């Protein structure tokens, strides 16, 4: 008799949380629709991930191999998003993976939007490609705001995420360990090639650090609110 084949149980969509708007700003119906279309979202992220690694091909070619993990920021975090969604849907959730996806997609989704408006001057550049980047990365930030529906942002998991993305900020802008700074190449408007004393470098660095802090604060705030709610429920019981 052949051994039975194990078929993973697909996770159901979790109920909504009673979170304040600053922690869960998307309408509950939109969150639920996103989770219902999880495989579509995975496919879109997969396409974006492939494009993202292709986009970084020249920068990777100029970067020592050991530092490659810190260069392709956006495709790396969309890969985290894919892994987060798939692990949840297949009933194999990993808190650290969800935290990496949340912090990373929120951070780099918003970071690219900031860069396009402050450095690449998207409003006057007249380049449709810049607007493509704005829309695509705004979508990354928005999808991060759905993760709380199925994720537990434990303190160790958030700690792992902030350690990774904090390290990324350090080697991107402040202390390159091997070779030069590893931040994403900027557009031509405020940047002189190879010159890290220009305003664009400071703007990008400030945005990256602030967004790392913001995403960490939001993840931990969601954790605190849930613990408070559970405490109230136990008190009523």
Say what each PLM segment does:
Residues 28-32, 88-100, 149-156:
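Membrane-interface helix-boundary motifs at transmembrane edges
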Residues 48-92:
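Selected alpha-helical membrane-embedding segments in polytopic membrane proteins
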Residues 25-42:
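N-terminal membrane topogenic signal
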């Amino acid at each position: 008799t052949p051994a039975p084949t194990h078929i993973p149980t697909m996770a159901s969509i979790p109920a909504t949380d009673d979170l304040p708007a600053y922690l869960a700003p998307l309408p509950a119906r939109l969150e639920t629709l996103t989770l219902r279309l999880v495989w579509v979202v995975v496919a879109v992220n997969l396409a974006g991930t492939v494009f993202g690694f292709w986009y970084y091909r020249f920068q990777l070619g100029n970067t020592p191999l050991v530092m490659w993990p810190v260069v392709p920021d956006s495709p790396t975090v969309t890969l985290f998003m894919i892994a987060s969604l798939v692990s949840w849907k297949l009933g194999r959730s990993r808190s650290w993976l969800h935290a990496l996806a949340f912090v990373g997609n929120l951070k780099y989704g918003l970071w690219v939007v900031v860069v396009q408006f402050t450095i690449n001057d998207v409003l006057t550049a007249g380049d449709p490609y810049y607007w493509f980047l704005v829309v695509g990365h705004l979508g990354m930030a928005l999808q991060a705001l759905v993760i709380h529906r199925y994720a537990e942002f434990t303190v160790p998991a958030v700690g792992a995420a902030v350690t990774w993305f904090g390290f990324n900020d350090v080697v991107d802008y402040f202390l390159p360990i091997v070779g030069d700074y590893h931040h994403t190449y900027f557009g031509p408007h405020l940047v002189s090639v190879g010159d890290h004393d220009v305003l664009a470098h400071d703007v990008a660095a400030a945005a990256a650090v602030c967004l790392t802090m913001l995403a960490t604060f939001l993840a931990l705030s969601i954790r605190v609110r849930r613990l408070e709610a559970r405490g109230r429920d136990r008190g009523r019981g």
